[in-house]
Amino acid sequence: MRQQHEITTSGPLLGSDGNLLEPGWARSLLPVYRRADIKAGAMRVKEWDYYLITDGHIGLALTIADNGYMGLDSVSFLDFDGKWEKTTSRMRTLPLGRTQLPESSAEGASEISKGGYALTFYHEDGARMLSFHMDKFLGKEPIEGIVKLTDEPDESMVIATPFDKPGHFYYNQKINCMRAEGWIELGSRRYELTKDKFFAVLDWGRGVWTYHNTWYWGSASGELDGVPFGWNIGYGFGDTSAATENVLFYDGKIHKLGEVKFEIPMDEDGFEDFMKPWVFTSDDNRFYMNFTPVLDRSAFMSAGVVLSDQHQVFGHFTGRITLDDGTVLPVRDFFGFAEKVENKW
């Protein structure tokens, strides 16, 4: 297991050449992101806010993304008991940063409003507020709702990852284990979200990416014996020699993990079978999970030079984790997801 570099002081994320000044991981947004410091062209800059809210029975995902040449705004509703999901996305041509997503997740508003839909993520009285509506979401049925996120943990997963190509980087924050309350209306159906059952994660990303990437990401949020608990695991892109993004969240604090491997089963023809049980292991032996899939939110898109092949698989994890102090905790039927995504973008 290799040593990982923790960033412990605040300062600019990028130097005058547009490269990361200090690759590594942190427990908060200590590196300061400024879009004006980026040296790459606006076509290559990618910025997004992604929220997932679930109680293990239903789920809601909201995205506002400005990927330079393309904007992507989407709403997903997932029914894990009924084993179905619906994602509706709206694309925008050449936003080139005009979406004006905030330079910090801790302040400002992310918002987009176009014909037939609107999404707004903002702060109010110490809470994160998510407001959304989209016409013709499921056939002719609209979807709308308001969700309030509270109980943000003291620490989050923050990582600054360089690519081999100069001026390219990814700056990312994952905030797990937020409690969610509010409502969703899908057509004539209304769903009430109560904070004793629903948890949320924020995936906040800013960076300049290379063209072709494949990543693996897994996340879970909930309670373990009454204590807020979850994890963020992932790999696959950039130079992660300084740090991984693998962490446990336990009672508001981060417990750092080494490298985690996703073992996705194969079918008899040698292709990945995402709905068979997976296995997760770590090089420090602090994360071991068997994963039983329930639903694969799969999507494939190919248009010219752009390609996206996604498998976001939701299900239940059973295994064990080890905290920084050596405490071993068993985990049983803990709801979360793991994904494999290939992008040419």
Predicted ranges, named:
Residues M1-W345:
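Structured soluble/peripheral alpha/beta segments that form catalytic or ligand/cofactor-binding pockets
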